[in-house]
UniProtKB/Swiss-Prot annotation:
This protein's name: Galactinol synthase 10
Source taxonomy: Eukaryota, Viridiplantae, Streptophyta, Embryophyta, Tracheophyta
Annotated GO biological process: galactose metabolic process
Cellular compartments annotated: Cytoplasm
One GO CC term, this protein: cytoplasm
InterPro entries according to UniProt: Glyco_trans_8 (IPR002495), GNT1/Glycosyltrans_8 (IPR050587), Nucleotide-diphossugar_trans (IPR029044)
Originating species: Arabidopsis thaliana
Function: Galactinol synthase involved in the biosynthesis of raffinose family oligosaccharides (RFOs) that function as osmoprotectants. May promote plant stress tolerance.
Binding site for Mn(2+): D122, D124, H248
Cofactor(s) the protein needs: a divalent metal cation
Amino acid sequence: MAPTEMNIERKVEADVAVIPNDGKRAYVTFLAGNQDYWMGVVGLAKGLRKVKAAYPLVVAMLPDVPKEHRQILVAQGCIIREIEPVYPPENQAGYAMAYYVINYSKLRIWEFVEYEKMIYLDGDIQVFSNIDHLFDTPSGYLYAVKDCFCEGSWSKTPQYKIGYCQQSPEKVRWPMNSLGHVPPLYFNAGMLVFEPNLLTYEDLLQTVQVTTPTSFAEQPIPSTYNLVLAMLWRHPECIDLDQINVVHYCAKGSKPWRFTGEEEHMDREDIKMLVKKWWDIYEDTSLDYKTFVENESKLNPIVAALASKESGCDGLTSLAPSAAKSNP
């Protein structure tokens, strides 16, 4: 099924001042549905403020996100970009978990061509150190972190079943005699540094229409920029928590806003500590957008002037509508 034409953003009412930037760089995340994933996006927005990120957070959002959730995100300083779904081809409908069908729509972020470079972060990610320097990586590459095959989403693959993982391939050797060539490197798509480009978007769209999901050329960056929690118990020798910049709460039962500690591995002290760190940020009212801007304005007259100039705004939209339109 061909994707539908992308809508221009819809204006969302809110009484929050808008602080514009040059429009060249931004963080971006994705949201769909009416469940509680908006809480993850709020946590991410506040986390980026806590580490003094210099660039805004854009939320690529499907039309089914309720108005109430949109208003919450706008009030947290997020830039709302409504997108239309991208549907997987019929031959891939049963490839992986059901929510992966929704995840095809993330390809739309390559259409955000008003930005020169973006850093994509899943909504269940939290940043604990400033990562703005990743915007300065050489252009022309997709930057990502190698995935861990020990994570549950790989459970139906040969890699998972035999205990082979590209994070520590020396632990379990790949049986070439029975399974053929060693699998190509795969990255975890929860964190990406990329350059929006319409030709790239069309190439990606054509690729998923005719092939099964696979890896494509990228430049690896250290796992400190996307710690998949399964690494803590599968590859502890690879992890130094003091050096971690970005944590991906993707293991079963690890979403902080749903955390009970009852699922497997969730009773670990390091997991509890990381969940607490997420909640400390989420519940910190000084990191709420309006409060943060007011406090920063007292210290920075330039910020104060910008906030005053924009104080009449009743909504927050992206800096410019995307020029992108998909083919009918």
